[in-house]
Structures are given as C-alpha cells and as structure tokens.
Amino acid sequence: MTNATEQTYLWHRFTLREAVLLCFCATFIVLTRAGLRLHLHLPGHVMFCTMFFLLLARGCVPKLGSATLVGLITSLTSVLLGMGAGGPMVLVKFLLPALVVELAGFLSPAFVTSLLACATVGVLASMLRAASTTGVEMLIGMDEEIMLRKALISAAMNGLWGGLGALAVPSIIRRLRINGLIELKTEKSGAT
C-alpha cells in the first residue's frame, strides 16, 4: 500500500496517510463521546468506542506512538470543546488508556489479532481510566468507604465496556489485512 518514496511527516515516524488515519480514529472517539453524552444510566459506556478506536488505530498503524497520538489528539480536542467536568484531568483520562495500549503493543506487536489479548488490554486500560477519577476524589477528601465503592463499580463497568469494545478489533484487523487495505508490518519492517 505504501510507496518506496513515501516520506514520514509527523514525529518523524508517521506518513501522511497514517497520520490522517490516526486523526480519524481520534475524531471518531470525540464524536462518539459527544453522541453518548445521553443519560443512558450505564456507567462506563463511553469506553466501548474509546477502546475500540484506540486498538483499531494501533492495529492499522502498528508503530510505536500511534495509540498515544490518538489519545493526545482526543484529549486535547475534548479539553478544547469543553467535554467533561474534569478540566485538565480529561488529558489523563484519554492518555492513560492510550499508554496501556502502547505498552501492550511494545510487549507484543501482534496483540491486536488476538481476542484474548485485545480483551485483556481493553479491560486493563479502561480500569486504569476509572482509577484516575478515584485519585482526584481522594485528593479532594471524599469519604473512603464511598470512594472505594464508587471506584469498584466504576472500574468494573469501565472494564466491562472497554473489554466488549476491544473484542471487535481482531476480526476487523484481519478483514482489513485480507482485503489489502492495511499491510502486515511491524515497527522494524515499517521503518524507512
């Protein structure tokens, strides 16, 4: 899919095609977050699409920094649009799951083709996101018993939704590779 003369533009790592694809994934996270602001009474439901697009970005662009870039763009856009009551804490809420996806991609570059690995990464990243709000509640002095119960429920629901969103990624990545829409390459073979 890529030409031999294709240049890297963003962070001296991503081609223009890859950067546009990563920006689309970040945009879809923001759009689904805005669309899911409905009061569904389902805690953590936003993590379904967040984990889906973070893992899809890592699967389509298997380079170090791809999920981090998606998380950074998503968090900055969310802050600029005023989405969420956390203020600058929104940066952490998107960057922490992205860093978990990056760590998983660093340890096992082909993890996006495994259902179990994707589900595990989705659950862990989503639970870490829930822990970030617990840290803020601890700093403001919330009662420990209430905070721990809320943290447990929030982590469980975020993990459930994040894991469910992650389960769709391996089949989509396989189908994209079969149809020739993305290449099977790793960090070592993708570097020019």
Give the ranges of each region predicted by the language model.
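Juxtamembrane/transmembrane-helix boundary motifs in multi-pass membrane proteins
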Residues: 9, 13, 17, 42, ...
